[in-house]
A protein has these predicted regions:
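The substrate-binding groove and active-site-proximal loops of carbohydrate-active enzymes
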Residues: 31-39, 62-64, 91-103, 128-131, ...
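Metal-dependent polysaccharide deacetylase catalytic core of the NodB/CE4 family, i.e.
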Residues: 55-136, 148, 153-156, 181-184
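Active-site beta->alpha N-cap acidic-glycine motif
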Residues: 2-81
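Distinct, well-ordered alpha-helical segments
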Residues: 25, 71-78, 136-141, 165-166, ...
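Generic structural signal for well-ordered alpha-helices
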Residues: 45-49, 72-76, 104-111, 140, ...
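C-terminal domain-boundary segment and adjacent tail
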Residues: 2, 203-287
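Active-site-adjacent pocket scaffolds in enzyme catalytic domains
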Residues: 3-4, 116, 120-123, 127-226
Length: 287
């Protein structure tokens, strides 16, 4: 599905959750504890909106339902700034820990909440921690039944928490859902994440820039970049957790804003739906 554009339009996405929601801290912080933490998501999203406005860039914000319920003005602020609202589920639970019935309830509640707040349809979904895997592909059928048109939950890499390395690396149809995976680069018969979250924080920016150029110019495909508001917040409270979890979460927070700004300067970005409409195929929202 190549793009019909001279200079590639890439997708920029933000997973709107707070620092205490992450899977890395799930053994230390239960959902019942969330309300006891000082939220920082409003401040961090406001910073992101300022950066995007300065660079005249639109993005898709995959908003957690729990966040939307507590901060409805924040969701409206994002939408009023011209950005697309996507759904990140309600309770940030891995899909493999949910029954199909529980998953349906979670996404239905979150999607309806978001649509009520912005008075627009919500077509895009991303699972917490990219947790649509080979074992949970049934979730795509539920997403279609619940009204979603685009999914960005299948990460074609090997990882201890997620991943489906055999999946297509670029936008493709899975039944009637358009799957738009996070960007990877393929080397030595393996796919490697390069353009989002911890990959973006940990890798030198030059590698990320080279990888996106390879995807755009050599493979002639759009990139999918993602990050979280807490990744631009080096002053966030520290949570006691095992070293591996702390390394994944806290490393290079102080350099993330600069990397995001460099990406916006070096590449063209739009929302997920904007990029999908540029694909040389029928518009997925009307497919």
């Amino acid at each position: 599905m190549p793009l019909l554009t001279a200079r590639m339009l890439n997708a920029l996405s933000i997973d709107v959750e707070d620092y205490f929601h992450v899977e890395a801290f799930a053994t230390r912080v239960s959902p019942g504890d969330w309300i006891t933490f000082i939220p920082r998501v409003e401040k961090n999203v406001s910073l992101i909106l300022e950066i995007l406005a300065k660079n005249e860039t639109r993005a898709t914000f995959f908003v957690l339902g729990w966040i939307a319920e507590l901060f409805p003005k924040l969701v409206r602020q994002i939408a009023e700034a011209g950005h697309e609202i996507g759904c990140h589920g309600y309770a940030h639970q891995l899909i493999q820990r949910q029954s199909p019935e529980a998953f349906r309830k979670d996404v239905r509640m979150a999607r309806q909440l978001l649509m009520d707040q912005v008075q627009k349809p919500v077509h895009c979904y991303r699972a917490p921690s990219f947790s649509i895997t080979k074992a949970t592909l049934w979730a795509l059928d539920i997403l279609e039944e619940e009204g979603f048109k685009i999914d960005s939950s299948i990460f074609p890499v090997r990882h201890d928490l997620y991943g489906m390395p055999e999946s297509d690396r670029f936008p493709h149809w899975r039944n009637r859902i358009l799957e738009f995976p996070p960007t990877t680069i393929r080397r030595a018969n393996n796919n490697f994440g390069v353009a989002g979250g911890g990959y973006l924080r940990l890798l030198p920016y030059g590698i990320t820039r080279w990888a996106i150029r390879q995807v755009n110019e050599v493979e002639e495909q759009p990139a999918m970049v993602y990050f979280h508001p807490w990744e631009l917040d080096p002053e966030q409270p520290r949570i006691a957790a095992p070293f591996r979890s702390r390394f994944r979460h806290y490393t290079n927070l102080d350099g993330m804003q600069r990397k995001v700004e460099c990406l916006l300067s070096d590449f063209r970005f739009g929302s997920v739906s904007e990029v999908c409409k540029c694909l040389t195929t029928i518009d997925p929202v009307t497919h």
